[in-house]
From Swiss-Prot:
Matching InterPro entries: RNase_HII (IPR022898), RNase_HII/HIII (IPR001352), RNase_HII/HIII_dom (IPR024567), RNaseH-like_sf (IPR012337), RNaseH_sf (IPR036397)
Role this protein plays: Endonuclease that specifically degrades the RNA of RNA-DNA hybrids.
Ligand binding (a divalent metal cation): 78-79, 170
Documented EC number(s): 3.1.26.4
One Gene Ontology MF term: RNA binding
One biological process term in Gene Ontology: mismatch repair
Full protein name: Ribonuclease HII
HAMAP family, alphabetized: RNase_HII_B (MF_00052_B)
PANTHER family linked: RIBONUCLEASE H2 SUBUNIT A, RIBONUCLEASE HII
Superkingdom classification of source: Bacteria
Transmembrane domains' residue ranges: none
UniProt remark on cofactor binding: Manganese or magnesium. Binds 1 divalent metal ion per monomer in the absence of substrate. May bind a second metal ion after substrate binding.
Organism, scientific name: Bacillus cereus (strain AH820)
Catalytic activity annotation: Endonucleolytic cleavage to 5'-phosphomonoester
Length: 257
């Protein structure tokens, strides 16, 4: 291989997947600083990819154990929006195929918005089934947030196109005959729950951005309904909306004034 330019070396390293590649053996002997920087970057990317693969395998242990027992339709279930002062609680149930693989998958709160959006598209394209349920602030006020979350999870399961054989749920137990396991911080421990958390988070964030357009003075697209200083000041200045949860403090106290 003739001596390549730095740009050509960069393109080659994007193609090379193993140190055993003859082209890599030539590049690693190239003493130019630019090439050595690219080699160092290549090693870091390989290390990151390996860590992501190991993390994904660790997060697949619940699903793999159930598949070894002959189960196929394993649904991960999670919610987003229990804590905010405004907007709905959104839940998702996701059944993934056995060959599903997205390196970097994690709890939706630990991902950037750009990654969440990208993973959302991949999950939608690859999942066997996805069910989503949305519970309004009015229902939350009527039956309380815990019961609303539970009902939303049951609705998300009912909205799946096939009946799950087993449920992996993030920190909840559901009144259903379907066998289940409740996993504390499950969105960081199970790929199915993680996928559900991403579907629920992106769905809710999009809804809150629409509310932000409808009520620009409240900044919903920035705080997603959580009780930030900006949000509380907007409520003081412009009042309580129908999208606010009247049973939540300090909204409840503001209404009673």
């Amino acid at each position: 291989m003739q001596k390549v330019t730095i740009q050509e070396a960069e393109h080659l390293l994007q193609e090379i997947i193993s140190e055993e590649d003859d082209r890599f053996q030539i590049l690693i002997k190239d003493e130019r600083k630019g090439v050595q920087k690219l080699i160092s970057k290549w090693y870091k990317q390989k290390e990151l990819a390996q860590k992501e693969k190991e993390k994904f395998l660790e997060m697949s242990k619940y699903e793999n154990a159930l598949r070894e027992k002959g189960l196929t339709y394993i649904a991960g279930i999670d919610e987003v929006g229990r804590g905010p002062l405004a907007g709905p609680v959104v839940t998702a149930a996701v059944i993934l195929p056995e060959d599903f693989y997205i390196p970097g998958l994690n709890d939706s709160k630990k991902l950037s918005e750009a990654k969440r959006e990208r993973f959302y598209g991949e999950i939608k394209a690859k999942a066997i089934a996805i069910g989503v349920x949305i519970v309004s602030p009015q229902v939350i006020d009527e039956i309380n947030i815990y019961q609303a979350t539970k009902q939303a999870m049951l609705d998300a399961i009912a909205n799946l196109s096939c009946t799950p054989e087993y449920l992996l749920i993030d920190a909840m137990k559901l009144p259903t005959p379907i066998p289940q396991t409740s996993i504390i911080k499950g969105d960081a421990k199970s790929i199915s729950i993680s996928a559900a958390s991403i579907i629920a988070k992106v769905t809710r964030d999009r809804m809150m951005k629409e509310l932000g357009e409808k009520y620009p003075a409240y900044g919903f697209e920035q705080h997603m309904g959580y009780g930030t200083k900006q949000h509380l000041e907007a409520i003081e200045a412009h009042g309580v909306l129908e999208e606010h949860r009247k049973s939540f403090a300090p909204i409840k106290d503001m209404i009673q004034k």
